[in-house]
A protein has these predicted regions:
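Oxidoreductase and adenylate-handling cofactor-binding alpha/beta cores
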Residues: 99-118, 157-162, 307-320
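Rossmann-like adenosine-cofactor binding region
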Residues: 171-281
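Glycine-rich NAD(P)-binding loop of Rossmann-like domains
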Residues: 117-152, 198
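N-terminal glycine-/charge-rich "phosphate-binding" loop or analogous flexible N-terminal tail
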Residues: 1-44, 165, 169, 175, ...
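Phosphate/diphosphate ligand-binding glycine-rich loop within oxidoreductases
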Residues: 42-121, 130-134
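Rossmann-like dinucleotide-binding domain for NAD(H)/NADP(H)
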Residues: 237-332
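Phosphate-coordination loops involved in phosphoryl transfer and adenosine-cofactor binding
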Residues: 84, 137-140, 237
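Glycine-rich, N-terminal phosphate-binding loop of Rossmann-like dinucleotide-binding domains
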Residues: 51, 69, 214-216, 244, ...
Length: 332
């Protein structure tokens, strides 16, 4: 059987030994993130890649695709959705580092870092009372999306004394059935949130929040879910952190809300168009911290990814359910 790795990452000798122990005789082929439509997939059984070929008729032996991302919005409208070929994501590998990023972002907003850091630029001692930080203890954070990332955000932010609310597609499903590469983390039993909300309850959920963390995948249901009408429900002192995908908060709406003071501040790590280079209105928007989709980029990712790959390979060969299998119906 042949496994094709089409990414910037490479298998170490230890990685190869791990995979070959699961599947003796497995042929491992490495490419450097090549254009997948130009590849010869006629003899490929397993594909590890961020790109998924559309010309599936030329990949007649393809049995399974493993993505390197936690999300799968790149499959929207893709021909593979009309097949029985399973696609799995890297969900569960990013929880701790992305939650660290969210904790860092929350602290930066609470301590007014976009304004405080101007001190070095102006070289003038500021009015410190005007830049006073806000203690997190007793504040409320609303987490939209309560998968592996949202649950670890809840665990870390609760340690600061924040009251946690969560909003998810099915608030009755409180246990986490997904993969978690970080034992002892997250909220597997769903015990942290003080309140659970469904999508139809945004009008009850948002007014309670001092911070809103967006972790939901990009789907037709989540696209534009936080528009002007929804942001207007927040306190004017509220802050927004978006780490999943662009477009869930329409970019012109977010920029206008920050410029008008409807929203106190935001941290954005994902955009409709990536890579995002200027000109773009975000680059001149006040009280906005921008990062280039870095929250899930961390040292050690590839080792965790290969562990997941080996486990899913074992499951595939034994007929067990694959971890993180994408639902083509739900889009994630």
């Amino acid at each position: 059987m042949k496994l094709l790795l089409n990414t910037v990452y490479k298998f170490s000798a230890a990685h190869r030994a791990m995979l070959e122990a699961v599947c003796p005789g497995l042929e491992l082929v490495e490419l450097n993130n090549s254009a997948v439509e130009q590849l010869d997939g006629t003899e490929v059984d397993f594909l590890v890649s961020e790109q998924v070929p559309r010309n599936l008729e030329a990949w007649g032996r393809l049995h399974w695709v493993q993505l390197l991302s936690a999300g799968s919005n790149q499959l929207a409208g893709h021909p593979i959705q009309k097949t029985t070929i399973p696609v799995t994501t890297a969900s569960g590998t990013h929880g701790v580092p992305i939650a660290q990023y969210v904790s860092c972002a929350t602290l930066m907003l609470a301590h007014r870092m976009p304004q405080v850091l101007q001190y070095k630029e102006t070289q003038q001692w500021p009015n410190r009372l005007a830049l006073a930080g806000r203690p997190l203890r007793g504040q409320t954070v609303g987490i939209i999306g309560y998968g592996s990332i949202g649950r670890e955000c809840a665990r870390q932010l609760a340690a600061f004394g924040l009251r946690v609310l969560c909003l998810k597609r099915d608030p009755q499903a409180r246990q986490d059935e997904g993969f978690n590469a970080w034992p002892g983390t997250g909220d597997p039993e769903g015990r942290i949130p003080a309140g659970w909300f469904g999508p139809a309850q945004l009008t009850e959920f948002l007014p309670q929040c001092d911070y809103v963390v967006v972790t939901v995948p990009s789907t037709p249901q989540t696209e534009g879910m936080l528009g002007l009408a929804q942001l207007a429900l927040l306190k004017r002192s509220a802050h927004l952190i978006v780490i999943s995908r662009g477009g869930i908060v329409p970019e012109p709406v977010l920029a206008a809300a920050l410029r008008s003071g409807l929203l106190a501040g935001a941290v954005i790590d994902c955009y409709v168009q990536e890579p995002l280079n200027g000109p773009h209105e975000f680059f001149s928007t006040p009280n906005l911290i921008m990062t280039p989709h870095m929250s899930g980029v961390f040292e050690g990712f590839w080792n965790l990814m290969v562990d997941l790959l080996a486990e899913n390979l074992r499951r595939f060969l034994t007929g067990a359910p694959l971890l993180n299998r994408v639902s083509h119906r739900l889009g994630y």
